Regions:
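Short, strongly hydrophobic alpha-helical membrane anchors
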Residues: 1-9
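N-terminal Sec-pathway targeting helices
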Residues: 9-15, 219-224
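Alpha-helical membrane-embedded segments
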Residues: 13-31, 229-232
Length: 242
């Protein structure tokens, strides 16, 4: 460990390789950087004072006349998201693969003391939600029976070879009536009704604070930068020691 540390400290080219790799990681994260800039540059506004055809940021209560049920726990809500992943392979070659992912697209309202706006989520909408349900299974431990039935209805098989359980992770997230949410997107109007959708501009919906949303995007950039730095250093050491 000391030898490796001394090598790193005494060879500035290693730092340069790491810096270049980190910079490449940041460049690859240009989408996340764009989101960070959008969040920072867009002030939170009262719904009643929102300008049309501009990027806006709102915080308000979720509401809808059309209540739906989440597919896993059948929770009454106005928006849900489900992700199911399965561990495939073994040892160092094992990896988690998403086998099912879906999001509801029913419209709903967000209101504050000054007005309301109709939200139209779609498949491209970015949801940053807390995990309301987080379950996992392994060879010798099963998912809850109700979750197994729900997954079967969704076309997801929880059993593998010789009826052993698959290694799976199940996440369900939802927004309930009255939950406070954060929305960032472009404001428009149709027949006098204010609305935001993901067609004309990317839509971000979260049940967390603006600061936590920023944190999520920031750490994605940091992770990519660190990975880039590690790869840069590894490539430098590989080619210089051949």
């Amino acid at each position: 460990m000391d030898t490796l540390l001394n090598t790193l400290l005494n060879n500035p080219m290693i730092f340069l390789a790491g810096a270049l790799g980190g910079l490449l990681g940041v460049i690859v994260s240009y989408r996340e950087l764009g989101k960070i800039i959008r969040v920072i540059r867009t002030p939170t506004s009262e719904i009643g004072a929102l300008p049309l055809d501009e990027q806006v940021e709102i915080v308000g209560k979720a509401d809808s006349e059309m209540i739906i049920n989440s597919p896993i726990t059948k929770k009454t809500c106005i928006l849900w998201q489900v992700e199911v992943s399965e561990k495939r392979g073994s040892g160092k070659r094992s990896r988690w693969v998403t086998v099912y992912s879906n999001t509801s697209t029913k419209s709903f309202d967000v209101y504050d003391g000054t007005g309301k706006v109709q939200i139209f989520p779609n498949r491209l909408t970015e949801l940053i939600l807390r995990d309301d349900v987080r379950e996992s299974s392994g060879v010798f431990n099963s998912l809850d029976e109700g979750i197994q039935i729900a997954l079967k209805d969704l076309g997801v098989d929880t059993e593998g070879f010789l009826i052993f359980n698959k290694n799976m992770r199940v996440y369900e997230r939802y927004i309930e009536q009255g939950d406070q949410i954060y929305v960032l997107g472009k404001m428009s109007s149709k027949n006098g009704i204010k609305l935001m959708d993901g067609e004309s501009s990317p839509l971000i919906i979260s049940d967390q604070s603006e600061l936590r949303v920023l944190g999520r995007f920031f750490w994605r950039v940091v992770i990519n930068a660190l990975l880039g730095a590690v790869i840069g250093i590894a490539l430098f050491l590989y080619f210089t020691n051949r």
